[in-house]
Every structure is written in C-alpha cells, then in structure tokens.
C-alpha cells in the first residue's frame, strides 16, 4: 500500500459518515425501544470468543464466514463473531439459566470473511431478537410479528414473507432412508429447484415409489398459501410429523394474514435455509428490487444443548444498514445549532449550559479558530443584547 491510498478500507468494510451515522443511530434507538416494549432484554455478547463456542450447532456455513486467530495468552483458536445468534443462545443456556420463557434482543457489528451476494457488506450491523423456553405457535407468531414491527419502525414496506418448515424434509428424508451424503446432495438440488436432477437422483434410490414421489413434490410445492392444501394432497400418507408441520404453517400463515393483511405470503416447502440447525418453521422477508433476504429466522430448539440446556428457541435477525438503506426515508439534513463565541464570561457559560440542558445543540467557539458560525453548521448565535445579556439570535 502506497502513501496515496492508505485511506482505503478493505473490500466490503464500510464506515458511516454524517448524516448516515445519525440515521443509523436513530433507527437503533427506536428498535431497542420497540423490543423493550415487547419485553425483550438487551444483551451485548463479546466481539470475539473461542471458536468452539462461537460455532456451536451452526454447521459449516458459519465456519467459512468466520475470521479466525490465535489467542496469544494460551494458544487457543478464537473467532470474530459472524453471527450473534449462537452467542445469545449461550447466554440463555449458560449465563442466565432461567426456567421461564426468556426474551433477549441484541444489536452489534459482525464480521464476515466474504460478502453475502454481489457488492454485499462484510460488516453488517446485526439486529435480532430471540425467544427461549417456549415450544409452540404463540412464540413462532410473536417472533414473526416482532420482525414485521421492526420493518415498520424503520420505514420499510411492501414486504414479502416466505414460509417453510424443515421438519417436512427431515421426515421425508427419514422415510426414504437417506444417508448423510444422500441428504446433502438432495438438499443442494432442492435449493436450486433442479427438478430433472432431483428425479434422476430419486430414481436411483432404493425406496418405495410413493416415498420418492413425495420428495420430488417438494421441489414444486411453492406459491401462495394454497400450496399448503396442495401439499396435504401430494404428501398424504407421509406421517404425523409432516401433517403437524403443515398444520403449524397453516396456523402461522393465518395469524400473519389476520394481523398484517398488507404482507404478501409465499410458501416454499423446499426452502431449507438454516437446515443444519433449524428444527421447525423457518421464514424470510423480502422486498422488491432487493435480491437478498431482508431478514431471516425460525425455530432452532437444540442449539443450546452443548451449553447444558436444550431449550426451545425461535428468533430472527436482520441488518440495520440494509433497513436504513431500504427505508425510502431521505437522510436528514445536517443538524443546525447555536454558535457561542470564545468568551470566558461566566454568564455565557451559564447560558450555554442552560441551552444544552434543554436539548439545544451548542457549539462553543475556540480561540483563534477559522470559520464563522455558518461554516460550523449553525443557524443561530449567542450574542449580547443591548442589556449585555446573552441571547439567541438568528443568523
């Protein structure tokens, strides 16, 4: 790196300047207030942890996204967090160790080795909420509602909500007797909706024809909520786990349609995001014109097992930077203020303190500084009036 480009940041790493930084902070405060009103307690996990704790129960994807380094104190491998969800699960299972439903929220920068998608960020500001200790539709619906309220607070509309359920695939794969390698291959094909490949793969399995047909049907079971009725027909005879999963999706979809009729629902039974750690309903939110998911979430009941407690859990996460960018709200103009001259008069200092206590933005001049009040971003000044009192006047 030469002297002329020392200012360059690594690809995918951003800094927030005025007024964007102000908008991000405003949105952050609004979201934390929202979560507080819903009963979610704020936690602040560390930026770095030992790798075995940081990657617990998350699969290989998060491992690849995690920057790793060696602890100079003991030689153990550490990771810079790429996702705060496992950290919050550790806090619930080990640090808090409560027996009642626990609602936690979090917000902070995470770091990725590679961006998600073209020109994506490697340093998102992750925002999320998790509900531990309840296994049922009420907590699933609450999580989705809070995610949708998050969008509302940040001014993001025109939401598409995609619903799925990993237990349907797990049950059908178990019926077919798939090995771990077979399951991984089929999983990849389903994500690509590669129906000819799926059919050829299934035809090579030593499984009953009706079992293979049900797995093949997964690749086509996507669309509006009518897909759930079609799934009941095509997956008939698949077993109680599949029926229960379809019932759960129907109940969740009904609740969302009733409470948020403006949200457009899409059901995709082959969408298996987070398959390696999710255990039930999964969901993602999209907006037109944005190729990546805006938020994701779902049920993951086993993630706390290695920390000593496998509590039921569901939650969601999103990126604050993306929310602000998609909000459609113009960035506020630079805040204006009151300029106070560089004068040691105690009465001036008292006037400045009084104005600041009322929430005014007051910039105190510095002896010998260049630039006038307007150059300092001020539209008013503190000046002596005819009675030698310090008063605020417009420029």
Curated annotation (Swiss-Prot):
Protein known as: ATP phosphoribosyltransferase regulatory subunit
Keywords attached to this entry: Amino-acid biosynthesis, Cytoplasm, Histidine biosynthesis
Role played: Required for the first step of histidine biosynthesis. May allow the feedback regulation of ATP phosphoribosyltransferase activity by histidine.
Note, other: This function is generally fulfilled by the C-terminal part of HisG, which is missing in some bacteria such as this one.
GO cellular component: cytoplasm
Top-level taxon: Bacteria
Keyword Cell wall biogenesis/degradation part of the UniProt annotation: no
InterPro entries from the UniProt entry: aa-tRNA-synth_II/BPL/LPL, HisRS-like_core, HisRS/HisZ, HisZ
Subunit note: Heteromultimer composed of HisG and HisZ subunits.
Protein source organism: Thioalkalivibrio sulfidiphilus (strain HL-EbGR7)
Subcellular location: Cytoplasm
Region forming the signal peptide: none
Gene Ontology process terms (BP): L-histidine biosynthetic process
Pfam families for the chain: tRNA-synt_His
Family label: Belongs to the class-II aminoacyl-tRNA synthetase family. HisZ subfamily.
Pathway, per record: Amino-acid biosynthesis; L-histidine biosynthesis; L-histidine from 5-phospho-alpha-D-ribose 1-diphosphate: step 1/9
